[in-house]
Amino acid sequence: SFTSADEQAAFSIYDASNLNPLFDYQWSRDGLAASKSMSEKLIERNDPRLSRVFIDKDWNQMTGSADPKFLMAVNGENEEKQYFYNTSVFTYSQTAPTLFMSYHELLFLKAEALCRLNRSNEAEPVLKAACVVAIENTEVSVVAAMNAPSVVGYVGLSEKTAAITTTTAETYFETSVKPLFTATPLKEVMIQKYIAFFGASGESVEAYNDFRRMKALNENFIVLKNALN
């Protein structure tokens, strides 16, 4: 078992021609938009990632939900338009590593196991570490997007906010996550894990597996807003 993100199983040899799969798909099709339900989860928690992970149609980073160009696609009701809705910054993360097994996933699994064993006191510091490491991984992908060779060749994205520091991530946990964890430990672990998997790291399959697993257990922790599903 690894003990830091430096030891995680990452495919990290992307460059200007060997492309991150999410970037490759979006760059060739321009067919993705940012999810309103995901933005709502960030807004509800005053999550600092909100000011880092969304881009408007003119390639400007969104500073938050009050930004005049903050326009998310309503899940299941969005219009089929290009260059209209905001997109996630991750679709521009040309060189961001694909994580086969990330350090934050390992920590989230440990926190979940402890909660299921009714050992939430032990789970809390593990969840805090998971959240901090997950935010650090978000920043890796943001940096990759801001420096993406193909994107920079077309002027590039306009970065409007500062990187999230470890101190800010820890404060976020203490002020926003911890109260929710105290009230419903397992639920908040799974929601934080779901948010952490929002990115360019290829972890959506794990998020889908978690969602199926929770449904089988009649655990409706993750609320999806697409009425067509």
What residues fall within each predicted segment?
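Extracellular low-complexity, Gly/Ser/Thr-rich intrinsically disordered linkers
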Residues: 186-229
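Hydrophobic-face positions in mid-chain alpha helices that act as interaction patches
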Residues: 1-109, 116, 124-192, 196, ...
